Amino acid sequence: MSLASRRKVRIRLYGTNPADLDQVAREIVDLAKKMGVAVRGPIPLPTKRLMVTVRRAPSGQGYHTFDHWELRISKRLIDIEASERVLRRLMTIRVPDTVKIELQLI
């Protein structure tokens, strides 16, 4: 294959459920290895924690009690040297609703 038909693709996965994230990353890596292309990853990126503190009481009367809510966003990074055929196969992978995927051609 010529260099023009092979491109480097950076796949960024992120979501709130780390188990689903790891499953999708494993499927992508297995598919790439089966197709015979070079793979780097999955590289775990730092988990982002979104914290929200809210007051329990609806009015200003009474005790000062608060609830703390947290949302953790986990991220993974995979680099693949892929052709158009491999990219088309990547599009067929079933992805849960908790996982979002970004593809970037480098």
Swiss-Prot record:
The keyword Nucleus does not apply. One of its GO terms (cellular component) is small ribosomal subunit. The gene is rps10. HAMAP family: Ribosomal_uS10. This is Small ribosomal subunit protein uS10. Involved in the binding of tRNA to the ribosomes. It comes from the Archaea. It comes from Pyrobaculum calidifontis (strain DSM 21063 / JCM 11548 / VA1). Keywords: Ribonucleoprotein, Ribosomal protein.
